[in-house]
Amino acid sequence: TYAPAYYELAANGMYATPDEAVELARKAFRLDTTNKWYHQFYGQALIYAGRYDEALKVYRRLQTENPKDPDNYRILAALYEQKQSPVMALVTLDSAELRFGRIPVLSAMKRRLLVATNQIDKAVVEARAMVEAAPYEAQHHVILGDLYAIAKKDSLARAEYDRALQIDSTNVQTLMALADFHAGRQDYRALLAVTRQLFQSDELPLETKIKRFGQFTSDTRFYREYYFQLNDLASTLAIRYPDDKRVVELYAGHLIASGELEQALALYKIHLADQPPAEEYFRAVIDIESYLQHPDSVDKYVTRALELFPAKVDFHLSKGH
């Protein structure tokens, strides 16, 4: 039989287009229709080629012919969802649950589909069952808390977030979910308090922290109203990442926005000795000294900058002033 040859060609990428892969997989399956691997690979090839209607038919057959494989139910449900048939997707997942019991990946799909179809109460029931099955998993409490939040049951949502934090008070996913909850309720003091915890975590990328701080400070009125909390956030970053250029600029910018020019100037001067030298810091020092009308200091730092960056025209212009 040529079936293995066609299968190997398709499986090893020996084709020019996804449609050609489908044809190779189809030939392998047609030559040996009893081989479930050929059948599944044919369905996968159709999905990769974006031929979802045909893939749906294949996975319907696979579910019937091989009902003991939960992955067939997962993919069939995903295809129904892609076809905007969430009810059929839920029926498929219910069938899987009856046959296999609760499988985390299928339960997650089911909850998401229940939320998408506005069946929040049913999604809550699913999440409660998950929590009861594994009460010491923080993420399970977070999921249930998120669903309570969607249902506007805030006290129950907070209780679940609290339980998650009791299990692991530093879990970033839990803290992010709690921050989103407070943001949705416009409880900004609570949001900033949780954000401070996030800023103290090494697990949250610095880039994300900087982006969040920028979002908070982009609104001048918000900046004024919550200045002390935002100052605390900026200070937290400055302490944790004292030598990161992005944080130096963030903290200096915060000091300047706060009217603390002398402190910003002192911060930049500390970093003039950094290696390799950063022309941005020299430029900032010269600009602030110029604004403060310290001509002797301007000349001093322009001279130092030119020694390090002789090709930079703007430093020559500064010396000219």
Language-model features, listed with the residues they occupy:
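Amphipathic alpha-helical repeat scaffolds of TPR domains
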Residues: 3-10, 200-220, 243-246, 250
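Structural signature of tandem alpha-helical TPR/SEL1-like repeats
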Residues: 13-27, 49-61, 83-95, 117-129, ...
